[in-house]
Amino acid sequence: FQCPYCAAAHDTLKQFVAKHQDEVTLVYKHYPLTPIHPEAMSAAKAAWAAGQQGKFWEYHDALFSQQDKLGDTLYLEIARNLNLDLEKFERDRTLTTNAIAPDIQLAEKLGISGTPFFVMNGEIFSGAVQLSDIEEIFHRVQ
């Protein structure tokens, strides 16, 4: 959630998914690159905790829209704005390491070294891709 390329890709991906909502399923995997993004793990944990209350995507969007403010103050502010149960949110944030670890292990197993990273019907692409690039890949792999 701290990666500027991920933020750019996020906006493009939202457009793509909105256009093809009946044709694609978006699966999100956490891969916080903590050596270069010190808030990445904390943000991932907060998003996962929000997901336990059915608000992952709303929380995810809020994090990217306020990427320059990442930190505990923002995480709680977003949780409040989304009307999350704050006690459950805080409790779930402490349990997330085991939940996010499989995503990290999968990325490492696949040899992923950076984000954003995408797989569409077996085709791999990465970076802050343009909508036209995603459309081209989508039509090729259908």
What are these regions (language model features)?
Residues F1-R80, S113, H139:
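Structural alpha/beta surface segment adjacent to cysteine/selenocysteine redox centers
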